[in-house]
UniProtKB/Swiss-Prot annotation:
Binding site for Mg(2+) 3: 501, 509
Gene: TPS07
Swiss-Prot/TrEMBL domain comment: The Asp-Asp-Xaa-Xaa-Asp/Glu (DDXXD/E) motif is important for the catalytic activity, presumably through binding to Mg(2+).
Cofactor(s) this protein cannot do without: Mg(2+); Mn(2+)
Compartments in which it is found: Cytoplasm
Xref: Pfam families: Terpene_synth (PF01397), Terpene_synth_C (PF03936)
Key words of the record: Cytoplasm, Lyase, Magnesium, Manganese, Metal-binding
Cofactor note: Binds 3 Mg(2+) or Mn(2+) ions per subunit.
Pathway(s) of this molecule: Secondary metabolite biosynthesis; terpenoid biosynthesis
Renumbered ranges of motif DDXXD motif: 356-360
Protein name (Swiss-Prot/TrEMBL): Putative terpenoid synthase 7
Residues the entry annotates as binding Mg(2+) 2: 356, 360
Length: 604
């Protein structure tokens, strides 16, 4: 019997699972027919229901928008991995790691502590921080106790900005007052700063970690943005710095996915005159190992996805996005050794996306209610036997997937995490049916009414539950209780997710007659144009980002890794929605990002 290799949390360890039982294993397999993107534009198709129904609309014609299948799914089947290359990379990494660790921890004294923090910034930017978590924690804890002494007399814009960025990035509430020294007598930032391109860029990056109370950082963001655009366009900066400035203006490092940063930063660092050759090599080795690990997982996942047989069992209303799921999950589970967490989360996201598409894109209200009722009971309701085959398939897939989670986590005494996640999944289903009732009636509620339901339907709560479940023993019962309490951090993440989804998905919604969204609700309630609604909703997203930063810094009594996972989910959203609705339409920047991770392997 063929064996499938899956890597688990300890770097280099493996477990072999038989193909008949699949990933965890899965008790039932369904398959998928792979096709490429069509050359013609999207079109509406009309599909006649063929299953026996008891409703009056038995012979009704459904109208829905067929989405193109993903070109990436086919790519996953063609992947070839050289395991010996991965082993060789691990050996080189293991040899270099203690040398770099010694370098990081060898700095002593106040000035040397600054150098250590600047090196931490390099480690984060080069994608290496996960190798040195204990050393970074020890350094920042010790340094923050002497922060005033360390910052006293420091007048280099780059140094101050990077130190500020590193501390806030790791949850230390360093005061924005450190930037007061760069203001002139008129209360504005000194114009002389504009001659320091790297300093201006670092100040811009630091300003993106501002809270609702950091007014000086809002000024810094405005000041740096306009001048950096001019610097990048003027040709006075080195070309590699101009590229980095333009990338940062498009998406700041703070809101970028951690594993995407080194895609741009490694080439930048290599062109820096004073780069460290050993650190650069270590970054390339580590990134290459991550790429190969991801590809190995994709080969397994695309095989599993093909065997799910969605195309045979479902009308073509669902988003075929298994590889896109893997890419986005990397936002939370980045390091190569977290293979188990990624795979479990991808299975979970597949169920969430199928649920959303079924409610949002295809099911009649009768069918949607039956599915929601069955999920609430966590078993088929009486009406389910009379529902179309496709709907029973959706329900069975969801129930079977969670049963496999229980089988996987039960021996670890973590069934509570599956049960808690099920409850969040049910809440998402209920919110879906509430929105569906409005949508099918073409009802546009008040903005407040819509957001109350929409913040749950956008599945932030359900996604975080799945993330916590996938973490294994790290996420205790208290983690799920914290999520259940709906803390402010998570509430504002839901606001951000709901609005970004509706802003970027607005044209898609309207093209299929789906009028119940935040834009239309805001337009109706406040009597404004679409353009005005977009502008005001974007302001709410910006304000939500500041609150996220604030809550990340001020929340106490919650493990740091849970707070980081929440912010990482925010980063996933930012990348997915930065230019368009990147999950539904994975073109443009999303395609560039995925190509850099899965196709263009780094040269060492």
């Amino acid at each position: 019997m063929e064996a499938t290799s899956v890597f688990w949390p300890k770097l280099g360890s493996q477990i072999f699972l038989s193909s008949s039982t699949n990933l965890w294993p899965l008790s039932k397999l369904y398959g998928f027919h792979l096709t490429s993107f069509p050359s013609k534009p999207l079109k509406h198709i009309r599909l006649k229901a063929t299953n026996t129904l008891t409703f009056d609309d038995q012979e009704r014609i459904r109208k829905f928008k067929k989405l193109p299948t993903s070109e990436w799914t086919h790519y996953g089947h063609s992947i070839s991995i050289d395991v010996s290359e991965m082993d060789a990379l691990r050996k080189e990494i293991d040899a270099l790691k203690p040398i770099l660790k010694s370098t990081l921890m060898s700095f002593k004294g106040i000035d040397s502590t600054k150098k250590r923090i600047l090196m931490i910034y390099l480690l984060v930017s080069l994608g290496l921080a996960y190798h040195f978590e204990e050393e970074i924690y020890e350094t920042l804890k010790m340094s923050f106790e002497n922060i005033d002494k360390m910052m006293d007399g420091e007048d280099d814009l780059y140094t101050v900005s990077i130190i500020f960025w590193v501390f806030r990035r790791h949850g230390y509430h360093i005061s924005y007052g450190v930037f007061q020294r760069f203001k002139g007598s008129n209360g504005n930032f000194k114009e002389s700063l504009t001659r320091d391109a790297k300093g201006m860029l670092s100040l811009y990056e630091a300003a993106n970690l501002g809270t609702t109370k950091d007014f000086i950082l809002e000024e810094a963001l405005s000041f740096t943005s306009s001048h950096l655009e001019s610097l990048a366009a003027s040709g006075t900066c080195p070309p590699h710095l101009s590229v980095r400035i333009r990338n940062a203006l498009g998406l700041s490092q703070h809101w970028n996915m951690e594993m995407l940063v080194p895609v741009e930063f490694i080439p930048f660092y290599e062109q820096e005159i004073e780069h460290d050759e050993m650190l650069l090599k270590f970054a390339k080795l580590s990134f290459k190992l991550g790429q190969l690990q991801y590809l190995q997982e994709l080969k397994t996942l695309t095989k599993w996805y093909k065997e799910l047989d969605f195309a045979t069992n479902l009308p073509p209303y669902f988003r075929d996005r298994i590889v896109e799921h893997h890419f986005l999950v990397q936002a939370v589970f980045f390091s190569p050794q977290l293979s188990r967490e990624r795979i479990m989360m991808i299975q979970y996201f597949t169920g969430l996306a199928l649920l959303d598409d079924t409610f949002d894109r295809y099911a009649s209200l009768h069918e949607a209610e039956s599915l929601a009722n069955s999920l609430e009971r966590w078993a088929p309701d009486q009406a389910m036997d009379k529902q179309p085959d496709y709907l029973r398939f959706v329900l069975n897939f969801i129930l079977d997937t969670f049963e496999e989670f229980k089988r996987e986590l039960g021996p670890e005494e973590r069934s509570y995490s599956v049960n808690a996640t099920i409850e969040e999944f049910k809440a998402a289903a209920k919110a879906n049916i509430d929105l569906e009732k409005w949508a099918q009636a073409d009802h546009i509620p008040s903005f407040e009414e819509y957001m109350e339901v929409g913040e749950v339907e956008v599945t932030v709560y359900a996604s975080l539950a799945g993330i916590f479940m996938s973490m294994g023993k790290m996420a205790t019962k208290e983690a799920f209780e914290w999520l259940k309490s709906r803390p402010k951090l998570v509430q504002y993440l839901s606001i951000k997710g709901r609005l970004m989804n509706d802003l970027m998905g607005y044209e898609d919604d309207m093209s299929r007659g789906y009028v119940t969204n935040a834009v239309n609700c805001y337009m109706k309630q406040y009597g404004v144009t679409k353009e005005e609604a977009f502008r005001e909703l974007y302001k709410i997203v910006v304000a939500a980002n500041k609150t996220l930063n604030e809550e990340f810094l001020s929340t106490t009594g919650v493990p740091h890794f849970l707070l980081k996972a929440t912010i990482d989910l925010a980063r996933m959203m930012t990348v997915a929605y930065n230019v368009n609705e990147g999950f539904t339409n994975p073109q443009g920047k999303i395609k560039e990002y995925m190509t850099s991770m899965f196709v263009d392997q780094i040269h060492i």
